[in-house]
């Protein structure tokens, strides 16, 4: 099993010295291998076995290891120089496997024949014999050594299942040996990598030079980054500094320590194990980043899947299991994997399809983490040493071992560690995913914590290691060049061979050579030696060759290996030499390659770059000054990537031979070109050609370099890599990586977007992978044909995925990753132009429900680990430029500014730290928060740094809006292709309902810009995936303009800034700490003065104003009425008519204007003639004078247009250039005219008939030929200004229904009905099938909404009229859709739909919904699986969970009760918990399932509920009318549920004054479904009490009838009030509170506090004093209650109920969401509703953006009409 640590310390080792090997020729082993029986010849050699106890050496030639040989006395243990002439073969412990065994085994004196026996494989570190494909194995227990001809008969040992193997169960000695081995490895992992600390534990330290061998002591301190530990020696009391990667340290149990020669026996301390498990689990919940794969819920599964999480952990059990599992047993030397891979990176493998998202709030920011189980393939991020000749990086983490110069102290060494970036590639056991981890980071560069986490991943990595061994040699210790990329993320793209051909990847590390020379880091002996060139015949090579079916591929592969070995830099070993074609596991076709498992490239740096890049090759993207123009659009951040031509394909392209026909062999071709490109000169030239940060545009990636190399066939995978990788080497890996692959491995999404289809890279990639069923990429067919950016991504990313994984490695992260966080995703997506699939659709794209979007996105972040990426997996942000000595040197010389690409702590600790970084040390959950440090940093990708002439790092400034790039812009502008889940009609409807709020937003932002002082520069804060930017004062989500402190990043929203600035300074000082909006202090306690803050915007450039432009243009073109602030301000006097008879009048038009004439206001004040053709069959009315403040000409003539109206657009006044932020205000008047021309003009002509009826009913009489257009026009009219709800005398409804044609009073036609039509209408010219009833309903609804009376007496007088109107309304709606089964409750005021699955429900539902009325849908329970929702089912499944209960009678909280206690008393009163007086309590479960865990905890119930929710258009997460679906997954997804509400019934008379849920309101719409009603048994019947409660609750007769006639089970009594009445209710409650002597603090609200239940007395008082009447609704089993946003409501359970609610955001009620968000700002910071989780402004923006984009895409229809 691979040792947990990357260092060889603690590993088993086999040595063959020259004197013992002289008798045999060096070729013997190879010959033996060819003959198929290499065993005997090798076995007879004098092999020396032992354990590595220490390591030393400052340069590769001096690398030495201290070996404790088996069976020798103390004096015979000695130091062995790894590269000494006498060392012929040096093999290091690899994976634990099941190996075939022919000879019987002697067990307890009995010989037993067993076919498979646990054995350790070994990986060559030095191989002068050329073992080739020979696999050395040492059987456990008797330690018999065997040499197998290949790895075909080996199967990876998997702790989860193999620990139960019969052999182990029967033989205790063998079982103990296996457990001891696993324990050793786990302990090494704990010592060597974070985030584990062994502080306070007893340890024993090996003393190579001492007489006693072991020294005992207690760890007094362990550095979380360098891992150096200070040990207090027990005997002497002195403090020793020890590096566990250089000297063997073992944990001791309380029992006396013992030394056991080769291995430690069960040394693992239980504490250590628990600690580790707790750490892994802990992280899970907080930050389920892909990296946390093993966390939390996932961890539960892990145990099942993998056996014990821990056990597999470093054991390679899991890690190495990849290649050996199932089909994987391709015989790859997967065994070695372990050895190669940084074993410690164990990532528990979780069910691939599982993904958990958590939203955690930290310091005002909410981060989303997704627990996507990483595919377990994540490569270890630590730096393994590169293995010589491509062998697996032996102890991958040796990299951890710092370069130790001879004179350096251990501490120095610790810090200087260079992780030779060994490529740890693991063939993931998961279906063939092979990952090459770019763990090129120097150990020093990667915070150990990361390593630790990575190390966890390494388990998976171990699988990767196979790949590594297969040719991905670890890049050597180029310490100086910390691989920036994924820092070891498993991102490296996994290689898949399509036709079972293994892919060989050579991972060269040559680029690092120079760097090595420059830096001490590179000196780490061990790493370097690892990198030294060894004969290419390593047995792994042979294996890979044998695996490859294609001889040509084999040859090329060999060549590549050879060239690598010979051509690599001198001190280094050829990393790729032994490339085995991706272990079979990785390559075999049968294996599925889950998209997630594929490593994603970070757009900036292809994985391959990692290993092989010369220091220069890999320039930090950010180095380049934003202003530099480059061939490719550069990200402002990416400043200066050295343009070394090293595009991964550069050299390779030219050299690749056509033989690479099999995609799998691609790498081999690339390899050859490698060495050459490494020369610094070459690299420089190469660099010039390709910026590292390649555009995601695949076409671009391919261009040039790939050019010739790619063959249409599917040639080299390498071509697929990001073109940007600067070093040729990278190309090797690249092949595997998808150019656009960089993001969340878990999103499986089509790989190739239409835009990319021509891209050879993509083609190749898709060809290679497309055939795999699980394939990493979906086939092109998945793509919609319209050019979607390959990344439908942005929008689509699931936040989950975005997880913060990136955060973790803040320090070590390289920019490549950086990009991943922000730019790269956007870039990719921008480049491809794909808009992105809504989050909700993402899961559907990939086979495993995993999403590859990120892959496409190019986020380096999610990279490959599909599943359970190790928590700390390196997949974080890439390493900072400042960690690379060569780059720092260049930056100092050039004096160029660069972007801060890491957290303040890691990048610029001596400069001002942002708030997040300053608080880092105080975090409660340190390990978890570590992950976020980089991404959560306020200055990450925001602040610009620069070196002064003296080399001192200083702040140069911040990014400006002009430095945004197309990729960043892509997130904020409509996609060129159609957005998913939104059609033409929906777009118009959204614009009609939400457009005004959007305009309000824009106006607000413009006002904010006016507040910016002339001398101030506006900065640009790029949106960071998975981070919700929040105001530090009121915690509202920051939408765009805000003000930021340059020193600490403190940010305030526009409202708080305005409030503070407008307050006199004296008043501000007096407020002190009691100020409602407390402004936090700056770094040194100074207060934040508004004038010192820096104005900052989030939306790049002028995107916001451009969308505003498009909104007005679209409204004009499509005839969508507007009532937005911008129009009303400019045309107020002209456009706002008086109201008559409930309808708004058309401004500037007298009653006869309806004669079909259109009026237009010309921008210049002159008349603008407009002709509006109308259908010939519509009679025209004579035009009359038009009254207007400005002269207007109207043309009363109407021309025939085949029933299609074509409005002639009035000339537009000159407008400012589009670039002007305010230019769209310029022609508001003209646009307004256009809108009216489109809608009202023709309508007027149609309706005209002497202007008699505003609705022109005459034109609809039976004999009239009605234009199909007419109804649509009418609907458009209704979309008009919702001006006034006031009505003058009479009711237009009554007049309409009771009067004959032409008898209604004449009124202007521009009506202001306050709600849009049921069928959103397209502009004039588009035919509609709607008919009279369709808009008759609008009229009816309008009347009902506007029928108001000022006081109770008036209401009483009008009772008769109201009843008539209700009947008429019911009649109208019945006519509207007679096929929708429904009835009316609450005296005709509440719609009840009877068939939840009727697809037409939305039509009638919308009419009531847009008026703010609740709606009831019955019968949902008939669709649900009833057995899932029974109390006993919950009790059985979750009974042991601890929960908090609330006593409904007194609101007391009862903590830490088993949930079983609650469920047992659900229907049996005698089993209920009792209060102090002995009475059974009425309880409700508090927040269960907790937080957002419903989906994760109860997946089956989640699916059952979501599939059967009524009105799916609104309620489903991807519903077309659910605006929350429009929020790109790039952002933190709002928590919309589902949430469960479980409570007993309040069944006594005293309980009628108490509520189960007190009066409150929600910021979003919700549907609440009654899934179970439990009628309690015992202590008397309560039916009569329940009926009395219903009667006193004001329920109507129809409802009561349901109980008597239908025998239905009533569950709960609801009282819901209209949102518009909330203020009146608030006023009453304040009044009652004062009467009762209660205080009313300003930061509290009687409704938001949920402290009141309106009993019968209060409800009566509310009606009498304020005229407010609500809806009394009895919710029966299966009833779904729809509650509008902002509507106050309360619930009283009649019986025990289980209810489940899902929130949504409907277009009709966005205005309430908008208003409530502002209300919540003023609540106290501790208030549950205080935080703005809905992000309503962002939702409005993106909904409008998508709607406008869709309308633009359909403009051709307008042209045709």
UniProtKB/Swiss-Prot annotation:
Bias (Polar residues) ranges: 380-392, 453-468, 477-495, 723-745, 1142-1161, 1194-1204
SUPFAM superfamilies to which the protein is assigned, alphabetical: Clavaminate synthase-like
Annotated JmjC domain residues: 1498-1721
ZnF C6-type: positions: 1031-1056
Cofactor: Fe(2+)
Subcellular location: Nucleus
Database matches in InterPro entries: DUF7030, JHDM2-like, JmjC_dom, KDM3AB_Tudor, PWWP_KDM3B
Catalyzed reactions per annotation: N(6),N(6)-dimethyl-L-lysyl(9)-[histone H3] + 2 2-oxoglutarate + 2 O2 = L-lysyl(9)-[histone H3] + 2 formaldehyde + 2 succinate + 2 CO2
Modified-residue entries (Phosphothreonine), positions: 614
Tissue-level expression: Ubiquitous. Highly expressed in placenta, skeletal muscle, kidney, heart and liver.
GO molecular function annotations of the record: antioxidant activity; chromatin DNA binding; histone H3K9 demethylase activity; histone H3K9me/H3K9me2 demethylase activity; transcription coregulator activity; zinc ion binding
Biased composition (Basic and acidic residues): 298-309, 1174-1193
Site of covalent link Glycyl lysine isopeptide (Lys-Gly) (interchain with G-Cter in SUMO2): 788
Stretches the record annotates as Disordered: 253-346, 370-394, 438-496, 572-603, 714-762, 805-827, 1142-1220
EC main group: oxidoreductase
SMART domains assigned: JmjC
Cofactor binding, note field: Binds 1 Fe(2+) ion per subunit.
Placement of sequence motif LXXLL motif: 1293-1297
Modified residues (N-acetylalanine): 2
Extra remark beyond the main annotation: Its gene is located in the 5q region of the genome which is deleted in del(5q) interstitial deletion, a frequent deletion found in myeloid leukemias and myelodysplasias, suggesting that it may be a good candidate for the del(5q) tumor suppressor gene.
Reported function: Histone demethylase that specifically demethylates 'Lys-9' of histone H3, thereby playing a central role in histone code. Demethylation of Lys residue generates formaldehyde and succinate. May have tumor suppressor activity.
Protein name: Lysine-specific demethylase 3B
Source organism per UniProt: Homo sapiens
